[in-house]
Amino acid sequence: MSYEFILGGENTPRIKLYIACSLDGYIAREDGSIDWLTEYDNNPETDYGYSEFYASISTVLMGRKTYEQVLGFGDWPYAEKKTYVFTGQKEPLLREKNVEFVSGNVGEFTRQLKENTDKDIWLVGGSQLIRAFLEEDLVDDMIVFIVPIILGGGIPLFDRIGKEIKLKMTNTERYKSGLLRMEYNLKPT
């Protein structure tokens, strides 16, 4: 399968997983709910580096379930970014501005995307897509926010990846809210 892209970039963008999880490693409750995160929404005190991160990316990648979850929040928050939704279905729910649905080989698509994009790429999630990206060695950096809550169950951040992955910690930051930001490289820059 071949994919066509509009942009032609000179820099090699990095794929960055930017995500929050509970202390026990869950990104959502069993039903997909992330209500436990609302206490930590961006506020006037801090946006936890989100604005800077968001400005550094041109592309958003997510799975179908994550897409449907984000649609439930109201206005589409990524309208000015090109978004690719990985799905095995023909056409999930609604198509928002700048959204394209993708099926097929994750690795092949993503490698072609990186060759034709000039800014970094945000891997939003969910768990199944994160696993596929890690299995194919496609993630370059992880920015993980540990939220001070134990959910006791739910959708895990890392679900049976099937291999060991060594990380290099590049930065940590602790916020007054109790959140801990940890940054890792999976591949050398």
What are these regions (language model features)?
Residues 2-189:
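Enzymes that bind and transform nitrogen-containing heteroaromatic metabolites
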